[in-house]
UniProtKB/Swiss-Prot annotation:
<feature type="binding site">
    <location>
        <position position="155"/>
    </location>
    <ligand>
        <name>substrate</name>
    </ligand>
</feature>
<dbReference type="InterPro" id="IPR036291">
    <property type="entry name" value="NAD(P)-bd_dom_sf"/>
</dbReference>
<feature type="binding site">
    <location>
        <position position="91"/>
    </location>
    <ligand>
        <name>NAD(+)</name>
    </ligand>
</feature>
<dbReference type="GO" id="GO:0106283">
    <property type="term" value="F:ursodeoxycholate 7-beta-dehydrogenase (NAD+) activity"/>
</dbReference>
<feature type="active site" description="Proton acceptor">
    <location>
        <position position="168"/>
    </location>
</feature>
<feature type="modified residue" description="N-acetylalanine">
    <location>
        <position position="2"/>
    </location>
</feature>
<keyword id="KW-0560">Oxidoreductase</keyword>
<dbReference type="GO" id="GO:0008210">
    <property type="term" value="P:estrogen metabolic process"/>
</dbReference>
<dbReference type="GO" id="GO:0051289">
    <property type="term" value="P:protein homotetramerization"/>
</dbReference>
<feature type="binding site">
    <location>
        <position position="201"/>
    </location>
    <ligand>
        <name>NAD(+)</name>
    </ligand>
</feature>
<comment type="function">
    <text>Mitochondrial dehydrogenase involved in pathways of fatty acid, branched-chain amino acid and steroid metabolism. Acts as (S)-3-hydroxyacyl-CoA dehydrogenase in mitochondrial fatty acid beta-oxidation, a major degradation pathway of fatty acids. Catalyzes the third step in the beta-oxidation cycle, namely the reversible conversion of (S)-3-hydroxyacyl-CoA to 3-ketoacyl-CoA. Preferentially accepts straight medium- and short-chain acyl-CoA substrates with highest efficiency for (3S)-hydroxybutanoyl-CoA.</text>
</comment>
<dbReference type="GO" id="GO:0106282">
    <property type="term" value="F:isoursodeoxycholate 7-beta-dehydrogenase (NAD+) activity"/>
</dbReference>
<dbReference type="GO" id="GO:0106281">
    <property type="term" value="F:chenodeoxycholate 7-alpha-dehydrogenase (NAD+) activity"/>
</dbReference>
<feature type="binding site">
    <location>
        <position position="64"/>
    </location>
    <ligand>
        <name>NAD(+)</name>
    </ligand>
</feature>
<feature type="modified residue" description="N6-acetyllysine">
    <location>
        <position position="69"/>
    </location>
</feature>
<feature type="modified residue" description="N6-succinyllysine; alternate">
    <location>
        <position position="212"/>
    </location>
</feature>
<keyword id="KW-0276">Fatty acid metabolism</keyword>
Length: 261
């Protein structure tokens, strides 16, 4: 019988949005467990500094996830520096808060904002998936036939979108919806595809809010009643990588929260 679990030690991971938040926490954990990481993030991000902090087992690839040229360049960097790509973790994303129609302002949600969120969160994720799949397909399969693992980031907003989250929820719902068909598409290549749907996490977006607001948000989580720690997201990423029977599924990581309108 093929081994059910594999260690992350020695694996090479491409992590989008790797300069901060969930992406950086993932890089820190994987490198700490003996893996190698390539942080893919925008040129004006803190990616280069963070990669240097993580040492020789990490590199920075300045890139926009919506650009085929940029992502290909990042994959080339990973291959030339570390030999291959075994894991891809898609954490890059943006959010826009806007009602479909604001009656008080007599203003409709702009198509530009809606398209921008879809372009980065959904199309950007798919862009990375389709390109990294070709890279992983060149890997020698392990004893279980696996060549790679792709892990995407959705959100609980994919299931319980709040007021003003039409664009964000649509983008994350798209990631949820494409997880299974892509897993089926890539199964013959020995590539697994999973998605994590985080709840409220202590990422830069939330940690900059006033204490009163953060404490209120934390109180909405049934148990434990706090914001998630990015390290907990990273821990789940590692567990998914190491468990070869996880495929085509979306895992909520949210302390049982169900968002209200």
């Amino acid at each position: 019988m093929a081994a059910a679990c594999r260690s992350v030690k020695g694996l090479v991971a491409l992590i989008t949005g790797g300069a901060s938040g969930l992406g950086l926490a993932t890089a820190e954990r994987l490198v700490g467990q003996g893996a190698t990481a390539v942080l893919l993030d925008l040129p004006n991000s803190d990616g280069e500094t963070q990669a240097k902090k993580l040492g020789k087992s990490c590199a920075f690839a300045p890139a926009d996830v919506t650009s085929e040229k940029d992502v290909q360049a990042a994959l080339t960097l990973a291959r030339e520096k570390f030999g291959r790509v075994d894991v891809a973790v898609n954490c890059a994303g943006i959010a826009v808060a806007s009602k479909t129609y604001n009656l008080k302002k007599s203003q409709a949600h702009t198509l530009e904002d809606f398209q921008r969120v879809i372009n980065v969160n959904l199309i950007g994720t798919f862009n990375v998936i389709r390109l990294v799949a070709g890279e992983m397909g060149q890997n020698e399969p392990d004893q279980g036939g696996q060549r790679g693992v792709i892990i995407n980031t959705a959100s609980v907003a994919a299931f319980e979108g709040q007021v003003g989250q039409a664009a964000y929820s649509a983008s994350k719902g798209g990631i949820v919806g494409m997880t299974l068909p892509i897993a089926r598409d890539l199964a013959p290549m020995g590539i697994r595809v999973m998605t994590i749907a985080p709840g409220l996490f202590g990422t830069p977006l939330l940690t900059t809010l006033p204490d009163k607001v953060r404490n209120f948000l934390a109180s909405q989580v049934p148990f434990p009643s706090r914001l998630g720690d990015p390290a907990e997201y990273a821990h789940l990423v590692q567990a998914i990588i190491e468990n070869s029977f996880l495929n085509g599924e979306v895992i909520r990581l949210d302390g049982a929260i169900r968002m209200q309108p």
